Amino acid sequence: MAFISFPPRHPSSSARLPLTLIALDDWALSSITGVDSEKYIQGQVTADVSQMTEQQHLLAAHCDAKGKMWSTLRLFRERDGFAWIERRSVREAQLTELKKYAVFSKVVIAPDDERVLLGVAGFQARAALANVFSELPNSENQVVRDGASTLLWFEHPAERFLLVTDVATANMLTEKLHGEAELNNSQQWLALDIEAGIPVIDAANSGQFIPQATNLQALGGISFKKGCYTGQEMVARAKFRGANKRALWLLAGKASRVPEAGEDLELQMGENWRRTGAILAATQLDDGQLLVQAVMNNDLEAESVFRVRDDANTLHIVPLPYSLEE
């Protein structure tokens, strides 16, 4: 029996989110297995995976030779290698790039659509899951395994959980939470990632930005001490020569439409508007508010006013839950 996804509804902000079970159809799972898996992935991503424990997950970037990101990967260890979660729209291209040198290593790199990705967030999320699983992850142990399930813990914008599980467990959880939790699709998890300042790289923005332009250094996603990896020279230059002039920003406000990934925004300059930045992701909440995640210049004034191109409404900067100070 397959897992049936949930119908869409407008997402809520983390502050007002009732207990919600979220089908993460817009995200996709992949894995690398084999005796060379750690060495291989270490040579391809920005984070130091050799330092990762079984109880950690981290966000890393997979870059091209120029340091531009194919994708960001949410990495965690599995029994005989690693698994990662990324946006479904970039998975195929990202795996093609990752496999380019695999012929020289004892590894198997593959998409995994057998397992189901679910999010649990909102009011009393921990209590709801405690009725189902014997152990839950937390700030100390961010990854917990329970039977066929791997549970990942997220702190921001409010405590939430990502489940990598089999179809039977996904259906069982849906049944157990029936009547207690609201059901929603990927847009709700996307809204929470936007609030949390976690970069969302979809196909429209793949190959466009170095990791620092999306704040990955502030999220622990770049090691400047590890050995070489694809794109390392450009990523290091951006840090040590101050070559990066961009950052990821969170904007909120109103607009008559939800802009697409890859669109630009407009910045108010006196009585005029100037095109700026690139949108990574946007979603409209159930209260009508628009949330936008965008890469723009890193020296913007906090009071800057923006708008979706040619729109009558405006957007403003919202502080992120982490600091960009190094």
UniProtKB/Swiss-Prot annotation:
SUPFAM superfamilies membership: Aminomethyltransferase beta-barrel domain, Folate-binding domain
Example of a GO biological process term: iron-sulfur cluster assembly
Cellular location(s): Cytoplasm
UniProt: folate binding residues: W27, W189
GO molecular function: folic acid binding
Broad class of the protein's primary localization: cytoplasm
Alphabetical keyword list: Cytoplasm, Folate-binding, tRNA processing
Pfam families: GCV_T, YgfZ_barrel
GO cellular component, one term: cytoplasm
Signal peptide per UniProt: none
Function: Folate-binding protein involved in regulating the level of ATP-DnaA and in the modification of some tRNAs. It is probably a key factor in regulatory networks that act via tRNA modification, such as initiation of chromosomal replication.
Family under the similarity heading: Belongs to the tRNA-modifying YgfZ family.
UniProt protein name: tRNA-modifying protein YgfZ
Species per Swiss-Prot/TrEMBL record: Salmonella schwarzengrund (strain CVM19633)
UniProt lineage: Bacteria, Pseudomonadati, Pseudomonadota, Gammaproteobacteria, Enterobacterales
